[in-house]
């Protein structure tokens, strides 16, 4: 039988040459990318793919593979682009970390002479290099932009992005159009990184460089915390559905930005500085600004302060035709050594440099802190003009040439602004804040200092992770504060007695397990938020989340609070927090369930959690942590879903820092323990609910049953002989039989000799989730 083969093209963003002239034109055009793309599939954008294998996949000659005659060998995802990927669960493992298992970054950072680093960074700011000369003789503006763009990828929806891991070093971020020429900033920092080595990470150094840049230009920052450990490979992260730089297929309806995205176009940090899709409309741009900054956890005042504060320094670069700019770092030649955007416009350096295509300097003192941004913004009327590179920008009408040139002291320029700068004057809410900052420079300075600190530290998690002598003493609400332990902790004997009381309280195994899981599984390894510490499950908004079963939750918490009150009243200096009791209840239930399945296991428990108050909890800030879907509890909420159930399950597992085997064993265990949300029976493939058996895997892989779709989108397992319905399940259940790798894990736990291993592996993974936010244990 002849097989018809189809030639396909598989463009990869990491190897794509950037046409800067096209980028400028695409600011006002929509890009084209394949249909049907799903959230976790953005790395492989297949055009013209069919069910038949691709005949050829072409690569640039510079990347020839000796084993394939110069052609790239297709990966599984090229053949089956809709296949669920679980690669994200195994990213940045010890196998890719050159520092070794014993390396403790926090310990190394504590030995760092931070003042010496700051001194070296301060000297760097004015040490202009011929290979990349400093604007106005000062690298401050460049370093601020580098730090801002390192942190600015953060998004509240899933907590991903941000400065916390030094991801700007890797593709795709190192080659985003919005990060053009930040490769130069990192190269300027290399001698300092080389000098201090493992004592300071790239992630910390990039943020610190931004802080020192501000301080060196006369601005008083709010503080700095170290503690961002580097990773060694890029995240597999969904940045958008587009297949071209600056594409904007992420909108629907009346410009509704798709979640979880935080930027308006592929390859931008926030918004298009020329306005939406390059249209120079400051009012429309204000809408984009408000939405994107909100998605990075910033309110209107913080937004105005950040834009104006950042644009008090430095300049943009658009000296000439963007088509003369060469490829980004990931598309460069070997001899370029990771430096990109080499320009053929005149010298390509200094006054001839091209980055964004815009040519704007905002203030008369671009290397000194001032209120001149607001002074110029309100002093002049503005007319639309073009940069030398053809980009839309604004020039002050009838103004004198008062703005210094970055490299020629004999030259002056008229004041210029970006479309997005004018939004701060023309949007009514932004205008009110901007005018207040104009009239009250001290308020502006304080707001910018706080907003900058928040921008660069938002993804670091609780203050226990902050390191160094410059950590501010003030506790901020967005840090999700939890009281320090102020009492003697319970002993092993107390723990055993409390377990007995909990199990005798009338609460069932499913109730205790589901409550503990609901409390702990809010944790996000991305921005280190959530988790069981603080017992915020008893507070708004978590107590009212549908997935947490408010009625059952209230019952469980009521009984646990009674046990807590009784113990604390009679134990002298010892106290137990509700946060600890919630976890201990789940731990006791797991041990009982294992025993009921014929396996004795001791589940590790470490006290020391504390209870946060409602006043210490910003309800609006916690709202994004509410799951749209939670495959561990077989829950799909009413809000719009942007992932399939199995994709959402893997996504949540990655946020919980789980591996593929841990994901598998936890789902199988939680199903038989009856931890599904709202009493759902889907995936509860056992007749012994509450016993920690391997029944889920045994019955899922049982060939005497046949699965088929049901009318409501779930699935039914029917007996092959009688056609009777034996079980029901969801996509989050069936994926463990359908996905070859997950099935391989499931088979391990379905064997007749795996019962003890299953229980022990479940207990270990359970403890891991319960302790994800226990940063105090590693201190």
Swiss-Prot record:
Q: Does Metal-binding show up as a keyword for this record?
A: yes
- Catalytic activity, EC: 1.11.1.21
Citing just one GO molecular function, the answer is: metal ion binding
Crosslink feature (Tryptophyl-tyrosyl-methioninium (Trp-Tyr) (with M-296)) location: 148-270
Q: Which Gene3D superfamilies match?
A: 1.10.520.10, Peroxidase, domain 2
Pfam families, from UniProt?
peroxidase
- Which Gene Ontology CC terms are recorded? cytosol
Catalysed reactions, semicolon-separated? H2O2 + AH2 = A + 2 H2O; 2 H2O2 = O2 + 2 H2O
Instruction: Give cofactor(s), names only.
Output: heme b
Put simply, this protein is called Catalase-peroxidase
Residues of the site described as Transition state stabilizer: 145
Q: Which organism is it from?
A: Bradyrhizobium diazoefficiens (strain JCM 10833 / BCRC 13528 / IAM 13628 / NBRC 14792 / USDA 110)
Q: What is the lineage of its organism?
A: Bacteria, Pseudomonadati, Pseudomonadota, Alphaproteobacteria, Hyphomicrobiales
């Amino acid at each position: 039988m002849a097989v018809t083969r189809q030639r396909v093209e598989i463009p990869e963003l990491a190897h794509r040459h950037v046409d800067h002239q096209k980028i400028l034109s695409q600011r006002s055009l929509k890009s084209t990318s394949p249909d049907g793309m799903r959230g976790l599939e953005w790395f492989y954008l297949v055009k013209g793919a069919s069910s038949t294998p691709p005949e050829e996949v072409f690569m640039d000659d510079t990347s020839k593979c000796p084993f394939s005659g110069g052609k790239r060998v297709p990966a599984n995802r090229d053949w089956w682009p809709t296949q669920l990927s679980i690669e994200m669960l195994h990213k940045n493992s010890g196998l890719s970390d050159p520092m070794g298992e014993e390396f403790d970054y926090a310990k190394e950072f504590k030995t760092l002479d931070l003042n010496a680093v700051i001194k070296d960074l301060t000297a760097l700011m004015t040490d202009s290099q011929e290979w990349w000369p400093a604007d106005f003789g000062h690298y401050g503006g460049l370093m601020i932009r580098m730090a801002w763009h390192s942190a600015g990828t953060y998004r509240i929806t899933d907590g991903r992005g941000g400065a916390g891991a030094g991801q700007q070093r890797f593709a795709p971020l190192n080659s985003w159009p919005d990060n053009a020429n930040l490769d130069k900033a990192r190269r300027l920092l290399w001698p300092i990184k080389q000098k201090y080595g493992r004592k300071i990470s790239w992630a910390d150094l990039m943020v610190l460089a931004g802080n020192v840049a501000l301080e060196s230009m006369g601005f008083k920052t709010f503080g700095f915390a170290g503690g961002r450990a580097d990773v060694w490979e890029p995240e597999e992260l969904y940045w958008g559905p587009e297949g071209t730089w600056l594409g904007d297929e992420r909108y629907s309806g009346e410009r509704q930005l798709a979640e979880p995205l935080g930027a308006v176009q592929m390859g931008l940090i926030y918004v298009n500085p020329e306005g939406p899709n390059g249209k120079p409309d400051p009012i429309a741009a204000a809408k984009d600004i408000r939405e994107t900054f909100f998605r990075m956890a910033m309110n209107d005042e913080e937004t105005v302060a950040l834009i104006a504060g950042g644009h008090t320094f430095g300049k943009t670069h658009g000296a000439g035709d963007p088509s003369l700019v060469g490829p980004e770092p990931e598309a460069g030649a070997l001899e370029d050594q990771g430096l990109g955007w080499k320009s053929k416009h005149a010298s390509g350096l200094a006054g001839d440099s091209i980055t964004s295509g815009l040519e704007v300097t905002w203030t008369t003192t671009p290397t000194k802190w001032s209120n001149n941004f607001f002074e110029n913004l309100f002093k002049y009327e503005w007319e639309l003009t073009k940069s030398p590179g053809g980009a839309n920008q604004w020039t002050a009408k009838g103004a004198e040439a008062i703005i210094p040139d970055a490299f020629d002291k004999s030259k002056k320029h008229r004041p210029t602004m970006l479309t997005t700068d004018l939004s701060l004057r023309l949007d009514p809410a932004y205008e009110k804040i901007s005018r207040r900052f104009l009239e009250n420079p001290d308020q502006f300075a304080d707001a910018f200092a706080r907003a900058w600190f928040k921008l660069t530290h938002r993804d670091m998690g609780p203050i226990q992770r902050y390191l160094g002598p410059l950590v501010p003493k003030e506790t901020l609400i967005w840090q999700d504060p939890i009281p320090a332990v102020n009492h003697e902790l319970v002993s092993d004997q107390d723990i055993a007695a409390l377990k007995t009381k909990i199990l005798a309280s009338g609460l069932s195994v499913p109730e205790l397990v589901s409550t503990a899981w609901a409390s702990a599984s809010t944790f996000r390894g991305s921005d280190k938020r959530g988790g069981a510490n603080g017992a915020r499950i008893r507070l708004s908004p978590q107590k009212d989340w549908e997935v947490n079963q408010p009625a059952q939750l209230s019952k469980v918490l009521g009984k646990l609070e009674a046990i807590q009150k009784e113990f604390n009243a009679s134990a002298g200096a010892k106290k137990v927090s509700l946060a600890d009791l919630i976890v201990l209840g789940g731990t006791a239930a797991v041990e009982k369930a294992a025993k009921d399945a014929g396996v004795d296991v001791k589940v590790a428990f470490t006290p020391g959690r504390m209870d946060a108050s409602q006043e210490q909890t910003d309800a609006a800030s916690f709202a994004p942590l509410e799951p749209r879907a939670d495959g561990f509890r077989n829950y799909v909420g009413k809000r719009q879903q942007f992932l399939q159930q199995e994709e959402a399950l893997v996504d949540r597992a990655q946020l919980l820092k789980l591996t593929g085997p841990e994901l598998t064993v936890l789902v199988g265990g939680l199903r038989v323990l009856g931890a599904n949300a709202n009493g759902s029976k889907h995936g509860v493939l056992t007749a012994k609910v509450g016993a920690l058996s391997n029944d889920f895997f045994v019955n899922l892989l049982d060939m005497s049953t046949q699965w088929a779709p049901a009318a409501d989108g779930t699935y039914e397992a029917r007996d092959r002989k009688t056609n009777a319905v034996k079980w029901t399940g969801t996509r989050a259940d069936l994926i463990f039989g359908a996905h070859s790798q997950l099935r391989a894990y499931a088979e391990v736990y379905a064997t007749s000799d795996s019962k003890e291993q299953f229980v022990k592996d479940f207990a270990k993974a359970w403890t891991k989730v319960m302790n994800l936010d226990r940063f105090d244990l590693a201190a």
